[in-house]
Amino acid sequence: MDAKRSVDSAGNLDIDFTVIPKYRVSQVAFSGNNNFSGARLQKEIDTYAGSPLSEVGVKRDADKIKAYYQKKGYSLAKVSHSIERNEEDGSGAVIFEIDEGGDIEIQNIIFKGDPRVEKQYGFWGKIGRFLFGEDSKDFDSVDLLSEMKTDTWIPIISHLTDNGRFKEDEFQADIEKLRKFYRDHGYLDVEIDDSKIKFEFPDTDSPGDMDIVIDIVPNHQYKVGKVSFKGNTIKGFSDEELMKFVDYFNLTEGNVFSPSQVDKLIDQIREYYGQYGYVDTIVRVLRRPNVKTGDIDIVIEVIESKMFYLESINIQGNSKTKSEVIIRELALEPGEVFDLHRMKISENRLKETRFFDEVTLSPEETNIPQRKNLKIAVKEGRTGNLTFGAGFSTVESLVATVEITQGNFDYSNYKSYFQGAGQKFRIRGTIGLKSNQVIISFEEPWVFNRELAYGIDLYRTDSDYYSDYYSEMRLGVTNFLRKRIYERIEARLAYKLELVDIYNVDREIRGNVIPESDIGTRTISQVSLSFLRDTRDSYMVPTRGTRLELIQDVAGGPLLGQTNLYRIEARAGWWVPTFDFGKQVFSLVGRTGAVQGYGGKEVPYFERFFLGGGYNMRGFKYRKVGKLDPTTEEPLGGNTFAFASAEYSVELFNPVRFAVFYDIGFVNSDSWDWDPSDYCSDFGVGFRVLLMGAPMRIDLGFPLKAGDHNDDGMQFNFSFGTVF
């Protein structure tokens, strides 16, 4: 804006204002962006066509684009900008000129200054180190690399995982992780000087290949000196009682001083007090360096509070989920002692519902002495999903999936779009080269306001992958009740009514493999009772915990139907972490079962047990463990089976794990025949990769003990499924 003054002939003062409109952006263009589209880069900036033109804003956006490239591993990227103004219409075109510079691939990460970590391991050297390395209390370069997200480039694999590219923000976070690692091993004065970190490009023919050299000076290792307590006067909180926690976290005299273990100790003692209602108890650790010994003496000071009781429950943020759905998950009730331990259990239960993005439980002050409210703050999450998926396996071939789920369903509340009651609803359809499936499921987790779940499943499956000689269709409905009967043990009572159709049966297997009575349609009316205890830390990739399940089925007889059988099956799994480096995990999985017909009826072919393939005996073809028909080599199955598998896996780098395994099992024709003389066994190696939230498994299995009929040499098993 410009202003001019003038005086007319009459002596009046005239002021003229000239308004110059601010330039507006006519278009935003990108040049040189070979690896990322303009639409993708536009999401990173604030300048857009039609917005006011700001040179400061454009410069800021150029920096944002450069930061985005660096985040994606293009650390040599350069971004400049230019503005082409049009004086006539007051517009300007913004052009971002990008020199991507190629991505930097990390060839080696080298540690200097600490002799223990200077030895380097290649890709296969890491595997050997993980599997056959000595169990030492000290650490080496593999342990440091396990702490870092930054990793070396591995052909093919790095293209899938995006590991091996240099990303500045990740690397800076990794340096802090290394400092923390050393401090937690007692090296409180460790020096990792950013100015001494070197980025070397030794190969002139490959300018994007880089070595990282990190200089580490550990300095003195501190150990725990004398441990004492102060202020713990309440009965039941003696020095001897609290010393149990000190011992648990390895902070007794002579052990390495670890700041993170000290923090855990503080939290544990505070929670121990809070478990008995002493909610406001303050716990702090005083560190006193001992000049004479070079150790750190610890004084655990406790400022004890009064005992508090729970007054009321205050829920905030549940705009969609009913309050009663939240309250029924709580392990605390008004009038009880305010137990911090049970408060944490309640918080975990609410998180496990997956109804909320954020869940926070905390004590809240009241104006009543020794009374506190329980404040529950939640942030509603997205519980409905429409997912499309694709999968492939050596058994089922290619499969496409579409699924609609609502994890917080409410069939009676259309005003909130059928959400908020904590019910489960799912519709799933799959179509593939060898199988098709449709399933509709509903579950009410609290029937009559009791912790008793009711559910119903309607389904239809068509399968051709069981055999090349026949096809199978199942159409059915299952109703079930499920209840937690003790801590993590739950019982499930189910009734299933199913129609099974065996069709397209090849003439070669009629009668000798599949009895004529089993061909065509048959109904199954079955009651099942099962017990399950599951303590795994993850359903997708478990690293610790157990899973125990017992299943009993009875079909026919007074339940009617055309199938009379009794079946019992037991399943067990155990996962245990062994060493921290590489996040190594050992697992044992076993299954066994038997089925028998009654009332003069045999067990139908489609209800027998089978073993073999990528889901159990990985060194054998699908279903080829047990007796085969001598003419067609079609598996006959059996009425008794047992199977066990041992697997040891180690993380090479996130998200790739390497595994070695051993499988053993048998299938016997008769019911209740656990004679293992005809067992088969195999061993092998494999990889586990978590991509886009779904596991990919690649296994090579080699038969160890096999019969003449099923020794087909090495077996390749592959499976992968995801949603997008």
Q: What do the predicted segments below correspond to?
A:
Residues 35-40, 55, 60-72, 76-83, ...:
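Gram-negative/organellar outer-membrane beta-barrel architecture
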Residues 146, 683-701:
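A short, conserved beta-to-alpha structural element at the edge of catalytic cores
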Residues 374-383, 387-405, 484, 494, ...:
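Extended beta-strand-rich architecture
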Residues 101, 658-661, 695-701:
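Conserved active-site loop/cleft motifs that coordinate metal ions or position small ligands
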Residues 200, 286-293, 366-368, 494-500, ...:
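A glycine-rich phosphate-binding loop feature that marks nucleotide/adenosyl-phosphate handling sites
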Residues 1-353, 367-374, 383, 410, ...:
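Interaction-mediating elements
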Residues 34, 230-233, 316-319, 471-476, ...:
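Flexible, surface-exposed loop regions and adjacent strand-edge segments
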Residues 25, 76, 85-86, 104, ...:
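Short beta-strands and strand-coil junctions in structured, solvent-facing domains, enriched
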